[in-house]
Design a protein with these regions (language model features):
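Kelch-like beta-propeller repeat domains
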Residues: 1-190
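Short aromatic-centered micro-motifs
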Residues: 15, 64, 206, 224-225
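Short linear motifs in exposed loops
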Residues: 25, 74, 215-217, 235
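Short, surface-exposed beta-edge/turn micro-motifs
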Residues: 109, 218-221
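Short cationic/low-complexity microdomains
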Residues: 153-167, 201-216
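Residue-level detector of functionally pivotal "anchor" positions at catalytic/ligand-binding pockets or at interdomain
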Residues: 187-214, 237
Length: 238
């Protein structure tokens, strides 16, 4: 397949509509964000430059497709400011529409996904450096965001989000103590959210001898608390 006929970039958002891949935003090697939108036609193996994203340059946004439209949420602008905007793209009119913003701080490295019954958002890191373990659904009828029960584990960002029509699977990522994760979680509207590996307890927090939450570090005594109630003493010598 042909390479993208523009500068290289990272942190772009993407979604697929009608067998066409849409690539939105990103940041190029000089550190500036872009508002470019490209589509790739798998039939003709050709890239097509679409109209630029209406609401400015953006990178590390989250995107998905649902009911014939593309949706995009969060990201950082050209000044590296975290955004909470939510947008939809209509491939018929080739136009973007602003939808109700996310009702909290802007984020990046989050997940936006679609199931049979709508569009959902979860996790990510906000402008204060906090990682999240929450789950939200966009209510199209009420035109609002609704909070749902999140995962009973530490907040996380940058993992892999995969979906079937009925369920979302989320795995790996980095938690709020900067640990690389190998956990897997599954969510469905009928069953809620759970870990497929129920035999493996989930690490909930790490704290020091005084009970203060801390990031994991070598050469000090720490305590790990797990979802099954177990507490482990940890001392790693570097």
């Amino acid at each position: 397949s042909d390479s993208l006929p523009s500068f290289g970039r990272s942190g772009s958002a993407s979604f697929v509509l009608n067998d066409r891949l849409y690539l939105v935003g990103g940041k190029h090697a000089l550190g500036a964000a872009t508002d470019e939108v490209w589509s790739y036609d798998a039939v003709t193996s050709a890239w097509i430059q679409e109209a630029n994203f209406t609401f400015g340059a953006l990178w590390r946004a989250s995107a998905c497709a649902y009911n014939g439209k593309g949706f995009m949420l969060f990201g950082r602008d050209e000044n590296n400011q975290f955004q909470q905007g939510f947008y939809s793209f209509d491939p018929i009119t080739n136009q973007w529409e602003s939808l109700p913003s996310f009702p909290s701080l802007g984020r990046s490295h989050a997940a936006l996904f679609a199931l049979n019954d709508g569009v959902y958002a979860c996790f990510g890191i906000d402008s204060l450096g906090n990682s999240h373990n929450d789950l939200w659904k966009f209510n199209e009828i009420g035109n609002e965001w609704i909070a749902l029960p999140g995962i009973p584990a530490l907040g996380r960002r940058g993992g892999v989000c995969l979906t079937t029509q009925e369920s979302m699977y989320y795995t790996t990522g980095i938690d709020e103590t900067n640990n690389r994760l190998n956990q897997a979680w599954v969510y469905s509207p009928t069953l809620g959210i759970e870990s497929p590996s129920l035999k493996e307890p989930t690490l909930l927090e790490v704290y020091d001898i005084l009970g203060n939450p801390v990031a994991f570090a070598n050469n000090q005594l720490l305590f790990e608390r797990y979802s099954n109630g177990e507490v482990k003493k940890v001392f790693v010598i570097e």
